[in-house]
Design a protein with these regions (language model features):
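Active-site micro-motifs of SAM-dependent methyltransferase domains
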Residues: 25, 97, 127-130
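Catalytic-site neighborhood detector that most strongly recognizes the C-terminal catalytic loop/helix
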Residues: 113-131
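Ser/Thr-centric signal marking residues that sit
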Residues: 8-11, 87, 94, 108, ...
Length: 131
């Protein structure tokens, strides 16, 4: 498998995302508890990836899709009320929807989601209107 770090689709896709102290601490724990590797993988001059696969390479979208499928399958084998298909992109939609519903400023949400057009944030992701 060849690893390539691609640019974002739009310039607004490259952004700094604020995080709380709790989120920062969570990322620190992930890094501290991550399996120690002999050589840190470097892809296109970038290193410090949070999650590595069994070959000590960065986890990619396909890894996460499979991971989510496994979780849903295991959950559904245990519980009567079935969990619908969940993907990382569904989590993105859910985040956007919940932030909109909680009253986050639409322009702030647009920035966080990396949308160049506020219409994408308002129509595609939120499924609710701002009053």
């Amino acid at each position: 498998m060849e690893y390539v770090i691609e640019n974002t689709k739009t310039t607004s896709g490259t952004r700094e995302i604020p995080m709380s102290d709790e989120v920062y601490a969570c990322f620190q724990r992930i890094i501290e508890n991550r399996k120690k590797v002999k050589t840190e993988p470097m892809i296109d001059g970038k290193c410090g990836f949070l999650y590595l696969d069994k070959n000590d390479m960065p986890m990619v979208a396909l890894h996460w899709e499979k991971y989510f499928q496994h979780i849903c399958k295991k959950y559904n084998s245990i519980y009567k009320v079935q969990m619908p298909k969940v993907t990382p992109h569904v989590c993105r939609h859910t985040f956007c929807f919940n932030m909109a519903k909680s009253g986050m400023n639409p322009k702030t949400l647009q920035y966080l989601m990396g949308h160049s057009d506020i219409g994408v944030t308002m129509n595609t992701y939120t499924h609710i209107g701002y009053d």
